[in-house]
């Protein structure tokens, strides 16, 4: 049973501007593991990566119903890729989390569907 849905869209140029103060922004948004992946990226690929993670975390927090804040922070949510490259969310939840991330020339968008773990 679906228990939550969240979606977020972010302009890539907004993330690109925030990456000017790269380290501080990335430390606030990305987990240590995500920052390790980001270290190997440059230019537009780095912007897309960070924007996708930002949108995914915002979408997850909306699906949970809290938004980013006291109950859920950016660092409580980690986005990884499975063996096939599919993005997945790692967090402390009893729900099954379905994640989709997409990019265009100007935007990154993510959608999260939370499903009850009891079937």
UniProtKB/Swiss-Prot annotation:
Classification via Gene3D superfamilies: 4'-phosphopantetheinyl transferase domain
Signal peptide: none
Pfam family, one: ACPS
Highest taxon above the source species: Bacteria
Protein's GO biological process: fatty acid biosynthetic process; lysine biosynthetic process via aminoadipic acid
Enzyme class per UniProt: transferase
Enzyme Commission number, as recorded: 2.7.8.7
GO terms for cellular component: cytosol
Coiled-coil boundaries: none
Residues where Mg(2+) binds: 8, 58
Catalysis: reaction(s): apo-[ACP] + CoA = holo-[ACP] + adenosine 3',5'-bisphosphate + H(+)
Intracellular or extracellular location(s): Cytoplasm
Primary localization class, coarse: cytoplasm
Keyword terms of this UniProt record: Cytoplasm, Fatty acid biosynthesis, Fatty acid metabolism, Lipid biosynthesis, Lipid metabolism, Magnesium, Metal-binding, Transferase
GO terms assigned for molecular function: holo-[acyl-carrier-protein] synthase activity; magnesium ion binding
Cofactors named for this entry: Mg(2+)
HAMAP family per UniProt: AcpS
Family listed: Belongs to the P-Pant transferase superfamily. AcpS family.
Biological role: Transfers the 4'-phosphopantetheine moiety from coenzyme A to a Ser of acyl-carrier-protein.
Stated name of the protein: Holo-[acyl-carrier-protein] synthase
Species per Swiss-Prot/TrEMBL record: Bacillus mycoides (strain KBAB4)
Phylogenetic lineage: Bacteria, Bacillati, Bacillota, Bacilli, Bacillales
Gene name for this UniProt entry: acpS
């Amino acid at each position: 049973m679906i228990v939550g849905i969240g979606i977020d869209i972010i302009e890539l140029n907004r993330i690109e501007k925030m990456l000017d103060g790269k380290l501080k922004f990335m430390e606030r948004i990305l987990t240590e593991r995500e920052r390790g992946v980001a270290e190997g990226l440059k230019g537009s690929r780095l912007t897309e990566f960070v924007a996708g993670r930002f949108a995914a975390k915002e979408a997850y927090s909306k699906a949970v119903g809290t938004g980013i804040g006291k109950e859920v922070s950016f660092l409580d949510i980690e986005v990884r890729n499975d063996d096939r490259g599919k993005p997945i969310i790692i967090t402390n939840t009893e729900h099954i989390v379905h994640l989709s991330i997409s990019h265009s020339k100007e935007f990154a968008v993510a959608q999260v569907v939370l499903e009850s773990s009891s079937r």
